[in-house]
Amino acid sequence: GFGSFLGKALKAGLKLGANLLGGAPQQ
């Protein structure tokens, strides 16, 4: 559902944000 999509987007956003702030891209 839409809630699941929001949850995934939020987690992805947090992960990207942490990588950008940390300056250490990890995938």
Curated annotation (Swiss-Prot):
Tell where it localizes: Secreted
Q: In which tissues is it expressed?
A: Expressed by the skin glands.
Q: Is-annotated flag, keyword Chaperone? A: no
Q: Does this UniProt record's set of keywords contain Nuclease?
A: no
What's in the keyword line of the UniProt record? Amphibian defense peptide, Antimicrobial, Secreted
The terms describing its cellular component in GO are: extracellular region
The free-text function statement in the UniProt record for this protein reads: Antimicrobial peptide.
> What is the originating organism of this protein?
Xenopus ruwenzoriensis
GO annotation (BP), single: defense response
What protein am I looking at?
Caerulein precursor fragment R1
| Family of this protein | Belongs to the gastrin/cholecystokinin family.
